[in-house]
């Protein structure tokens, strides 16, 4: 093959599909090519060769599905225009143009776990690893133990996800029924609703935050005393506080006499004053698993 600068350079885009990766080729403006060579490598600094050439396509094939690639792995792709009708000194040759920029194909997430957290009255946030190629996400909400519950479907545009950090994002759902045990099925979709990824199911028990919470620190003993109104229909509570960088549990018990409708607990704080953050949330047991309600967080000194 001989290099011919006149053939120009194509522009390449790559997106993960349910199977493999799809390449979209924007041809050179010169329009002298008869087709394209397609290359794939796990290394960014690869040089085009017969070892990494995966296909030759004709000039009208501007979309190519590499269904042999593992869409859970990251690859670099490139294409270059070719002219198979070239001639040099009376001999038929293939001319090659300039290699396109190498494009990193973003893989589908390997970790498909979803964390569901009750975020307020009728609200749940779902946290998960982003699917780069997704145009939108579909959430299907069901109630496994309520046959009368009407299935809810919500669609969220990929651009409207809240960024948590790293590759983690979250979607917030509102208008859900309190007091229900709900299941959430999350799917990443292409623009035409083709499914890219089906995430693992997540669950939440729709319980609100504890009410009438008070927290007081005894100045002399440096003991933090907390109390809050006991909730109906829960199996227990979890109270955690961060002291010296370590998470400690505040033991809770039912109040006595005038406080018999309250839960109370205490823990000794360090003598040195500082900001100490504690969190309380109720939980419901289903089988051996605990499902937590909305957390409430306070800072004491």
Over which residues does each language-model region extend?
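Acidic surface patches and DE-rich sequence motifs
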Residues: 1-4, 49, 58, 83, ...
